[in-house]
Amino acid sequence: PGNALAQRLDHARRFATDHRIRIVSPDDFGLIDTLAFHFDEPFADASALPTFRVCELAREQVTVALSGDGADEAFAGYRRHRFQMQGERIRGLIPASVRQPLFGALGKYYPKADWAPRALRAKSTFLELAGEGGAAYAASVGVTPHALRHRLYDQDMKSRLGAYRAEDRYIKAMAEAPARDPLDRAQYADIRIWLPGDILTKTDRMSMAVSLEAREPLLDHRLVEFAARLPVNQRIRGNSGKYLLKKAMEPYLPQDILYRQKMGFVTPISAWFRGALAGEATAIAGGSSLARTGWFDPKALAKIAADHKSGMADHGRLLWQLLMLDKSLERLFGI
């Protein structure tokens, strides 16, 4: 977006850096085959696309680059970390005998408003508060809720999956964490699963795809171990994550940079799938590799694409997941 570009240019002027810009557009969608080739597995984080472009741009000038991965996981920088703390406070204040039926009923009858601003999408929040903390946090990490995934499968695949839930791996990691505080358990699971499985895999493969060596100074084990020993109020204070890390940088960075709202490295795939790439979304239910597996209900896939295009729901990230799976199946198995 234009305001983000203006901010970056302003930062470059402040610090006298040599700033270069590359804008990712729907035309870059053709890279999806390149991504499938380099990941060699169905890797579905859509930020892989701009990560590839950034690495490509950096490689024009250097052969080694520093990455900032790891700070959010070590110092509790994600919004879900704050939500986990707030949710646990509510669970601690309201007995389960009251909380579960109360929030369960609110979650059941509150309208599902995927089209609405995030602040108004309270249905999932109510359902998470009705449940226990580990399950709620695991759900917040995922892109597609279990119930929606289940609706996509055909009957045979549902039978084969049985009681399997992808979230159970996260719940198990939190339960086994050598910690008592809920935030510590959540961060432990992030470092064990999310960081190596998503963030570092993405950075490593996209950088090596262009022969760029990416190094991770914030993952020095001494820094991560130091962060793990910090009390919760040194990681999250008020509405700010990475509290101590930001305080340490106050002598060097202006307030408007340090304390601005967190901006993820996102790709506007939801808008793309309603515009230039709407045809790609519709094709998922037709003659794609995905359709030929027999794993999914074609009508359910078609409804996902139609609801997204009409604005009834935001399935942009799910559609990207499905397309990456489709491209990976085509590449790996020739389906």
Task: Map each language-model feature to its residues.
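Active-site adenylate/phosphate-handling loop in enzymes that bind or generate adenylated species
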Residues: 53-113, 151, 194, 199, ...
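Short low-complexity, flexible loop/linker segments enriched in glycine and/or proline
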Residues: 34-38, 59, 81-83, 272-274
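Adenylate-forming
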Residues: 47-53
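Adenosyl-5′-phosphate
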Residues: 47, 60, 64-66, 117-335
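A conserved beta-strand->alpha-helix junction
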Residues: 1-38, 64, 161-169
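Short, polar/flexible loop-turn hinges at active-site or ligand-entry regions and domain interfaces
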Residues: 41-44, 89-93, 233-237
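Short beta-strand segments
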Residues: 21-23, 54, 66-67, 324
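Acyl-group handling in specialized metabolite and lipid biosynthesis
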Residues: 1, 14, 18-23, 44, ...
